[in-house]
């Protein structure tokens, strides 16, 4: 006897702190773009496992850290580019190169960040970062 397939339950955000979550969602969309964020949330909508990650990312990364008053978004983007390049996190780096451009960084500033990465983190990490940024610049016509 075949078991009836249970209807998939929609996963919904379940933040611990609604204000941090709302602030985080606003900041996340401002930096990464609403389309990217909406796609990420939609991708987690049928997966409680992934929705938990989206909650934590939105609430703490974007609501608590990125929304703090101590550093402007442009500076936070500079830090992220250097850290992601050093860690060789290609997909996230691509996302944050786009975010950095959204936050007002210039191609020249991004180049200087990755040159600094070359000295302190190594040529291979910097080369990958340059390739990633170059692809983003071409996509965006920068």
Task: Tell where the protein language model's regions lie, with residue ranges.
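Short Asp/Glu-rich motifs
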Residues: 119-120, 137
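Substrate/cofactor-recognition hotspot
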Residues: 116, 123-127
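Short, conserved micro-motifs enriched in small and acidic residues
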Residues: 73, 77, 123-124
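Mid-chain, well-packed structural core segment of small domains
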Residues: 78-81, 85-111
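Residues at alpha-helix boundaries and short interhelical turns
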Residues: 69, 87-90, 104, 121-124, ...
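A glycine-rich phosphate/pyrophosphate-binding beta-strand-loop-alpha-helix module
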Residues: 108-113, 128-131
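Short alpha-helical scaffolding segments that buttress acidic/His motifs in well-ordered protein cores
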Residues: 57-61, 78-85, 113-118
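Acidic, glycine/proline-rich low-complexity segments that act as flexible tails and inter-domain linkers
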Residues: 2-74, 102, 128-142
